[in-house]
Amino acid sequence: MLAIRLSRGGSRKRPFYHVVATDSRNARDSNFIERLGFFNPQARGQEEELRLDLERIEYWQSQGGQISDRVKSLIKQYKKSANK
């Protein structure tokens, strides 16, 4: 089954997450089909905190992709900030 979820990157004590489309059986940080955006929970200064490609997320969802709870909340947050 296809999953749209977070994949952790960054260094110790400074996480950085990529939003990826991947097979749900794959390990969290292993191979992915497509990178759909990123989330930087500890953005500093001018660093961007969140960027998502909503068109591609909708495409993968139409192909049967299951969106994780955390990614759903990030999409909601992204849409809210885009309306400002």
From Swiss-Prot:
GO terms for molecular function: structural constituent of ribosome. InterPro entries: Ribosomal_bS16, Ribosomal_bS16_dom_sf. GO terms for cellular component: cytoplasm; small ribosomal subunit. It comes from the Bacteria. SUPFAM superfamilies: Ribosomal protein S16. Keywords: Ribonucleoprotein, Ribosomal protein. One of its GO terms (biological process) is translation. Pfam families: Ribosomal_S16. PANTHER family: 30S RIBOSOMAL PROTEIN S16 (PTHR12919), SMALL RIBOSOMAL SUBUNIT PROTEIN BS16M (PTHR12919:SF20). Belongs to the bacterial ribosomal protein bS16 family. This is Small ribosomal subunit protein bS16. It comes from Dichelobacter nodosus (strain VCS1703A). The gene is rpsP.
